[in-house]
């Protein structure tokens, strides 16, 4: 089991539930825009939120933002260690840095000391695009071993400063490399791991890459917190994260819709019905499994694990629950009958 750190009031690692993170795409110094985006993310289910801090103005906005939100706030720092110190003074809940890119060991120690005094954890955030030149030369490019060596070098740097309140990420945009790096890292350290596939792209491909790269690791028991990185509204990242956690069997946050791919036995126009059921399930928070099946011959049996479901036929279909047929229903009433049964659950 990994060690546990506290990011504000959210436990990460040590058997705590896998938490969902996102990152604002607003200018952090624009407090109003940033707060409004965070409030939308909270409503969607985000549990830890990160903001970029590239300037002193952004760092000084941290207290005003924290005062109006309800989830832990993380500062993303590159190069300027003084910005990390300002954020620590402003009450930040976690700092993300690469210790190797903020200067001398004295500067790293200053950040470590400021965080230790205030109980602020540090995430070592290694990205394939910013690997050290010597590691790129040693391994001939971005490899899993290069990512892990970079991360462990940063860990030693913080440990040498007497700092142990650490979370680690090793992200790149190539899913197999990403997964291998996290598996290697898990074998070498028990610090909590922040999962993600960086630069995953737009939702169409980015969600697929993240589902494989993050969901695959979660199914192997690797990972303590995650962010799905998408070129999109950050709320979409949170929705995707919840779906990945549900598909991996980690957390249920609503209904699970199962439906068959249809075949020659299907005697009704099932695809639009499945989509209508999916649409009407939005907003439902019941942790149930709902089935839409293509035929009355195999449907109820194949979906016997579903809490409730429908199977269509020619002109009429079946409403069933836990594999047992409840009644026949005219085809045009199937969806309404299904949701009447869902309301009873």
Role assignments for model-derived ranges:
Residues 25, 31, 42-68, 96-104, ...:
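Glycine-rich, proline-tolerant flexible connector loops at the mouths of alpha/beta enzymes
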Residues 127-130, 135-282:
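Catalytic alpha/beta core domains of metabolic enzymes, predominantly
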Residues 68-71, 88-95, 116-119, 186-192, ...:
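Glycine-enriched alpha-helix->loop->beta-strand junction motifs that scaffold or abut catalytic
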Residues 1-23, 116, 279:
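N-terminal amphipathic alpha-helix/helix-capping segment at the start of soluble metabolic enzymes
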Residues 55-77, 110-122, 182-193, 277-279:
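Alpha-helix-loop-beta-strand connector modules within alpha/beta enzyme cores
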Residues 82-123:
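Hydrophobic or amphipathic alpha-helical targeting/insertion segments
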Residues 15-33, 52-54, 71-79, 135-148, ...:
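Active-site mouth loops of central-metabolism enzymes
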Residues 18-24, 49-51, 73-77, 95-97, ...:
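Hydrophobic faces of well-ordered beta-strands that scaffold small-molecule active sites
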């Amino acid at each position: 089991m990994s060690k546990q750190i506290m990011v504000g009031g959210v436990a990460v690692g040590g058997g705590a539930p896998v938490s969902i993170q996102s990152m604002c795409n607003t200018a952090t110094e624009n407090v109003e825009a940033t707060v409004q985006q965070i409030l939308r993310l909270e409503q969607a289910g985000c549990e830890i939120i990160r903001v970029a801090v590239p300037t002193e103005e952004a760092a000084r906005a941290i207290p005003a933002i924290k005062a109006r939100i309800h989830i832990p706030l993380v500062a993303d720092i590159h190069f300027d260690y003084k910005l990390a110190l300002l954020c620590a003074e402003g009450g930040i809940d976690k700092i993300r840095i690469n210790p190797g890119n903020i200067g001398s060991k004295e500067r790293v120690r200053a950040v470590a000391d400021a965080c230790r005094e205030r109980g602020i954890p540090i995430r070592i955030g290694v990205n394939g695009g910013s690997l050290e030149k010597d590691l790129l030369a040693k391994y001939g490019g971005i490899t899993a071993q290069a990512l892990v060596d970079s991360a462990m070098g940063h860990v030693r740097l913080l440990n040498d400063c007497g700092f142990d309140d650490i979370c680690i990420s090793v992200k790149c945009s190539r899913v197999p490399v990403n997964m291998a790096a996290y598996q290697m890292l898990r074998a070498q350290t028990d610090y909590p791991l922040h999962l993600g596939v960086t630069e995953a792209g737009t939702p169409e491909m980015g969600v697929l890459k993240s589902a494989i790269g993050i969901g695959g690791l979660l199914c192997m028991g690797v990972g303590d917190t995650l962010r799905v990185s998408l070129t999109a509204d950050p709320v979409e990242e949170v929705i995707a994260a919840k779906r990945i956690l549900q598909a991996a069997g980690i957390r249920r946050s609503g209904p699970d819709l199962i439906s068959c791919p249809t075949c020659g036995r299907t005697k009704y126009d099932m695809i639009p019905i499945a989509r209508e059921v999916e649409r009407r399930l939005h907003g439902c928070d019941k942790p149930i499994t709902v089935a839409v099946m293509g035929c009355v011959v195999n449907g109820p049996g194949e979906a016997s694990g579903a809490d409730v479901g429908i199977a269509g036929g020619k002109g009429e279909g079946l409403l069933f629950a836990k594999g047992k047929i409840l009644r026949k229903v005219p085809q045009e009433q199937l969806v309404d009958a299904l949701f009447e049964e869902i309301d009873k659950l």
